[in-house]
Amino acid sequence: MDWVAVIVSIIPFVGVLLAVGFYTLLERKILAIIMIRKGPSKVSYMGILQPFSDAGKLLCKEFIVPTRANVGPFILAPALMLAISLLGWLLYPYKSAEVFYVFGVILFMVITSVSVYGVMMSGWASNSKYSLLGAVRAMAQSISYEIPMGFIFFCVVLCSGVFMFQEISVFQQSLFFFFLPLCVVMLVWMLCMLAETNRAPFDFVEGESELVSGYNVEYSGGGFAVMFIAEYSSILLSSVMSAAMFFGGNEALVGFFMMVFAIFFVVVRASLPRLRYDKLMNLCWTVLLCVMLTASVCVVVLVGV
């Protein structure tokens, strides 16, 4: 076995885990600034090691399985969520990657579609009313936003002519950012990504004021830590894919706009309240779907001309 190849293939995942830790610190700092308070500042210099302290604390705590829970699925759900979120990073469009998926766009759609299964499994296996309601919301929400998201990919693929995220990014280097002709599509994409990652104002799956903590209310210790890492890994993945699809070009541009989108998620969380659940359903089925159908027709006509 070529151990060098194994180590090289593991490095990106280690980088993702480190990025998640520092992203949580960045989020807490930005939220503190917006709320006019200090934020984490005690652990190491300016609190820079706070995420690792929190992770160590969670992993050292006992992982409690509720008496009425279904033990197998309850333990498997966090691992499934983390595996699915890390699998998406294989599609990350960097030039030094050894594997490029020819149908990366389709694979990304599959990954985002099956990501809800981990939430569904945890909610059902917990045997808690709050967890089950969170899982049911996640399933209905997933069906609602994935249809407009499919039309978004259709528009981007039609403009670039390829299904690889790497090629979509490179295509924009020679012409222009897809953000310019597809600004409406990008707006719908950002709404879909907020719903996909269960972030405010679409954080119905957790809904602290309604469901205590939603699907993960019964999790503690390492199980909760793994779920937390999976959630924030998905946020960073959504940021980098957004940058590659609409602000592609060289790696520096993709990295810069990835940070912009990542900060956007935090600012939206601090700025907007949670909507009513029926408002999201109405938005997806009556507004976003109609907008994307119209946009798809316009893109087909313009590309054909």
Swiss-Prot record:
List the InterPro entries hit by this protein, alphabetically: NADH_UbQ_OxRdtase_su1/FPO (IPR001694), NADH_UbQ_OxRdtase_su1_CS (IPR018086)
* EC number(s) from the headed UniProt entry: 7.1.1.2
Show the stretches that span the lipid bilayer: 3-23, 71-91, 99-119, 145-165, 175-195, 221-241, 246-266, 285-305
The identity of this protein, by name, is NADH-ubiquinone oxidoreductase chain 1
What PANTHER family does this protein map onto?
NADH DEHYDROGENASE SUBUNIT 1 (PTHR11432), NADH-UBIQUINONE OXIDOREDUCTASE CHAIN 1 (PTHR11432:SF3)
Q: What does this protein do?
A: Core subunit of the mitochondrial membrane respiratory chain NADH dehydrogenase (Complex I) that is believed to belong to the minimal assembly required for catalysis. Complex I functions in the transfer of electrons from NADH to the respiratory chain. The immediate electron acceptor for the enzyme is believed to be ubiquinone.
Q: Which reactions appear under catalytic activity for this entry?
A: a ubiquinone + NADH + 5 H(+)(in) = a ubiquinol + NAD(+) + 4 H(+)(out)
User: Which HAMAP family does the annotation name?
Assistant: NDH1_NuoH
Q: Name the membrane topology term.
A: Multi-pass membrane protein
The domain of life is Eukaryota
Cysteines joined through disulfide linkages: none
State the Gene Ontology BP annotations: aerobic respiration
